[in-house]
Amino acid sequence: MKGLLHFLLAKIILLALASSFVYCYEPSPLQDYCVATNETNGVYVNGKFCKDPKCVTANDFYTSGLNVPGNTSTGPGVKITVVDVKRMPGLNTLGVDIARIDFAPGGLYPPHTHPRGSEIFLVMKGKLFVGFVSSNEYNYTLFTKVLYPGDVFVFPKGLIQFHANIGKTNAVVIAATGSQNPGRIIIGNAVFGSKPLIDPKVLAKAFALDFNKVKYFQAVFS
């Protein structure tokens, strides 16, 4: 009987810990809203100080500009216009953000991950080739799709994904993530452009590359 009680107690503790781990990455709000402010005399929640609720206005939950095309003339031909907590303070603690992504013809959003949020795409214009790769649990399976206006595609949190404009015109996507700060890790930049750089010998062995090739990639990405 004593052993059974110990077993049940251990099980309850493990379940409680598991529940806390599930919610620790994006805490549930304990109030209706916590509008972010730069003032430091308020309550500190989710990395931001909360504005006095009596001073909150509708403008704290509003922004505009996603109708304006982004400049895609530099880099890989992609411009991301993000509405995050910096641009809309009322997003703080709400667990979402939204962005407009503009692609020039041939534009590419390189392989990357969002470590803190899943992402959903709504194609507004153009023709996009998108995909993501599963983890080792599912043998690094590649899932791809060609998307057209009105199509929706979702990318699971933390998995490597990419988006390419394969049409002859500009493409526009409205993207939302399940985090006010989903983070972004561009794979090439992280591996070959870290600060400080990863030892080239490590990367040469990991990717079965010539040492000089690794040095070249590091020069490109750093």
UniProtKB/Swiss-Prot annotation:
GO molecular function: manganese ion binding
CDD domains assigned: cupin_OxOx (cd02241)
GO cellular component: apoplast
SUPFAM superfamilies, sorted: RmlC-like cupins (SSF51182)
Subcellular localization: Secreted, Extracellular space, Apoplast
Disulfide partners: C34-C50
Lineage: superkingdom: Eukaryota
Keyword Zinc: no
Subunit structure: Oligomer (believed to be a pentamer but probably hexamer).
Family the UniProt entry places it in: Belongs to the germin family.
Role: May play a role in plant defense. Probably has no oxalate oxidase activity even if the active site is conserved.
Protein name, entry field: Germin-like protein subfamily 1 member 5
Organism: Arabidopsis thaliana
